[in-house]
Amino acid sequence: MGERDQSSDTDQERKGGKHPYSSHYSSDFGSSPQSSGPSSPVNTPPCASNREKNPKRHLSDHHVRHQTVRKVSPKAIPNKKGVRVGFRSQSLNREPLRKDPDIVTKRVLSARLLKITELQNEVSELQVKLAQLLKENKALKSLQYRQEKALSKFEDAENEISQLIHRHNGEITALKERLRKSQEKERMAEKRVKDTEGELFRTKFSLQKLKKISEARHLPERDDLAKKLVSAELKLDNTERKIKELSKNLELSTNSFQRQLLAERKRAFEAHDENKILQKELQRLHHKLKEKEKELDIKNIYANRLPKSSPKKEKEIARKHASCQSDFTDLCTKAVQTAEDFEPEEFPFTAQTVLCYENRWDGSEYLPSYLEYQERNEHGSESLSSTLEQEGKYSDDQDSCTAKQETGKSECEWEREELDKVKGKSSLLGRTEKLVLEAGSVQTESYQAQTIDKFQDEAERLKTEMLLAKLNEINKELQDPQSLSRPLLPLLPNFESKLYSPDRSLRPYTFSESLDRSFNGQHLSDMSFLTPRDEGQSPGLIRSPAPSDEFSFGSYVPSFGKTPGKSNPPSQKNSLLDFQSNMSEGLSKDSLDFISRKEKKATLMEQLFGTSASASATNTSASTTTNTTTNTNTNTNTNTNTNCNVPSKSIDSHFPAASRGDLDPLHFLSGDRSSRVREPDGEDEDLFLSEGRSFNPNRHRLKHTSTKPTVTAVDSIDEDIEEVTLR
């Protein structure tokens, strides 16, 4: 291959018109003119001579040349001998070319050519080696690539093997764990098998033993069990027989209970109907009572007072309320006094019936509280009426609802509801009873409220009468100084001397008992009656003009208040009559002197108050003279009547001032309806209108005629009060 490449190179050089050695020749023989033309054999000798002349330069050029010189064929060598050198060598040497080189130069040139050929051969060999090395390098590179590829595959295979080994190890551990568990289960199963085999062996042994025992007929335990079985069967028969008997008794008792329940149901219906009738009757009587009250307010304003009984009487009344249902209606309606049975008469005040005493509290202190209490009672009465109406509606609605529901319910439920209904009715009756009792108390308080205004008028009239009596006494003392040694006028008796006298306890007075009961333990020593404490006062001080709103009598200033509740009229009547009987002798002696001085008193009254006051003073003096003449004859009768028939009453506990021991002057100022004495003018009869009332049915009212004395004590007016029963 190297030879082919060299020949191809030479051919190319030939085609280009250049010789591979032309450079050498041109450098050596540059002055020849035929250097540019084709080589000829004629020109070769001078070229050879030039080469021989400059061998060193040729060698230096030869060393400078590159190794790219190719191998020249031997045929081309003689053709190039005659070629002239180029213009370069000619210009450098400036020597003429020799046409015939010598032999030495030829030899040198031939050696040079040989050397060149040798070197070219070496180059070609080296080129061949280089090509072989390149091919070998390519083969090695391809081999290396294939080896690297195979190596990478091998490495991948190694990695897969490690993963496979890891997975295999995990599977091995899992299988080992399963093996361990299965071995444990197997051991446990073997243990259970052993236990079951042992138990089976024991059961077989016990079964054989029991079979042997069962085959044995005559055993003591078998006999005992047989006896127990027989006794149990007998007991079972007895219990069954008893159960049958008890079931029969139960049926009979249920039948009787059904009959009894039906009877009780009928009674309950009857009681319900009767209750409705009684409620209607109660409402009718309530309306009737209201009408009677209105009539009493119109006809007789003094007959509407309802006193409160003593604590003992209240306890008895409470027992009656608990024992019988009809008693509470009687007690509630007993306070109503009709105008047909009893028409009390009004009696004017007289000076003999005036009883005054001091009180630690004035009426103005507790009057507002009493009025507030009356207003609360009025609101209570209104709420009471509304609750009664609501309860009536509720009972009617309940009856209608139960009547509708009876058809859809079973018999047992219906009976149970009937019993509950009877209980509800009884509770409703209890509530109505309480409400009626409260209504009675409200009525009493309303009666008291109606009399407050009347008491004020009576108190004013009492003031005027007491002023007249005091003025009469002052006038008598001024005109007749010798009368100071005489006993006081009966208009203003010396109550203080009577209260502290030693023979007071011997007289049949009922003041102490009644006052102790009425005023919560207050004794009479706490009170001081209207009497001049200092008789030695100067007339100027006594005759000092009194203010218009109150009257002053010596050191006493009377306080007039409204009556809080029921007073104690029988005890007051007794005390008044005792006082009249004791003072009758003094009245008979002083009556003539009093008549002679009444004209002077009238003139004094005209100077102070006008003609109306003088007229009232003359009327009072006239009534006093007539009463004194009659009281002398009736002393014994009044004492016996009052001492025998005076019940003890208590002050109304509803009034707030009574709980603290307040003493109302009008409790003893009995001219407010309780102890008035009227003169015998032939038109009306003398009668004490008692503000209280006794609930004792054993007491009887004293009948009086015109032949009896003027002053008559009336014990009770229970027969004159309409008693309504709901039986």
UniProtKB/Swiss-Prot annotation:
A single Gene Ontology CC term: nucleoplasm
Chief place of localization: cytoplasm
Function: Involved in intraflagellar protein (IFT) transport in photoreceptor cilia.
Coiled-coil stretches noted in the UniProt entry, renumbered to this chain: 112-301, 449-480
Protein's name in the database: Lebercilin
Organism: Rattus norvegicus (Rat)
Region of interest (Disordered), residue spans: 1-82, 381-409, 526-577, 613-692
Ranges of compositional bias, category Basic residues: 54-73
Assembly with partners or alone: Interacts with NINL. Interacts with OFD1. Interacts with FAM161A. Interacts with FAM161A. Interacts with components of the IFT complex B.
Localization of this protein: Cytoplasm, Cytoskeleton; Cytoplasm, Cytoskeleton, Cilium axoneme; Cytoplasm, Cytoskeleton, Cilium basal body
InterPro entries given in the database record: Lebercilin-like, Lebercilin_dom
Gene Ontology BP, a term: photoreceptor cell maintenance
